[in-house]
Amino acid sequence: RLTKWKGKVASLSPSLGQLVATVSPIALGRALLIDANRALVAATWGGAGLLVTVGSASAACVETPDGVFVCSVPETTTQSLSATGTLLDVTIDPGASFTTTAGNALDLTGNAGITFLNNNTDATITGDLSGIEALNTGSGALSITTKSTTTGSSVYGINATNSGSSLSINAAGTTGNSVGINAYNSGSGALTIITTGTTAANTSIFSTGIEANNNGTDLTITTSGSTRGGAGIVATNDGSGDLSITT
């Protein structure tokens, strides 16, 4: 029998003594933790039975169904989100934010396309290394849209690499140490970058506000805010289409 307090399992009755005797504590503990997110379990084993207390905290990003993540609470550790054989679809809800003192804020990895959507201006993204690292190694498009500030304290604000079809980035204020926005598209489609705020890197001669390399079709960069760094914009189009920069 399960006893609940405030909707959470608090104890199991002594009638589970026979079960306790026939399975290992590790196996039973794992079974009890199914679907528990970051559960903290304290178990006392004795002749009277089993006492289990569970305290859990919601993860910033929850996956349901496969490949679909919704991030809704503040997080201070790297969120590594991935999908294999299906689109990686990440949505940032109001109330979420990401601030890490080690690593990247968000690591996005897929082989069938990636879509990242943050329509919330207060859902800031700050990583000790990079703000957003996105890598699509297979088919499909890579798309990043964020209306909040994105900061990479040591490396990139946004770093996106695509091997599928098109790569598109639509970003508000973005700051990196070496590069504000770094985009590389080896896919078959276009590379498009749109910025609506300041895009900046540090002022060393080796830094770049926006760096874009395309091997697909068109390369288009449109900025409505300032773009700063040792170099403002560095764009290389080795694809079959046009190169267009509008500031």
Predicted feature residues:
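Sec/Tat signal peptide C-region and signal peptidase I cleavage site
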Residues: 38, 53-60
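Beta-strand-rich solenoid/repeat architectures in extracellular/passenger domains
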Residues: 65, 69-77, 81-103, 118-129, ...
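Terminal targeting and flexible regions in eukaryotic proteins, enriched
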Residues: 43, 49-55
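N-terminal cationic leader/targeting segments used for protein routing and processing
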Residues: 5-9, 38, 120, 163, ...
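Bacterial Sec-dependent N-terminal signal peptides
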Residues: 1-46
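Glycine-rich beta-solenoid repeat tracts in large extracellular/virion proteins
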Residues: 78-84, 103-111, 130-136, 156-162, ...
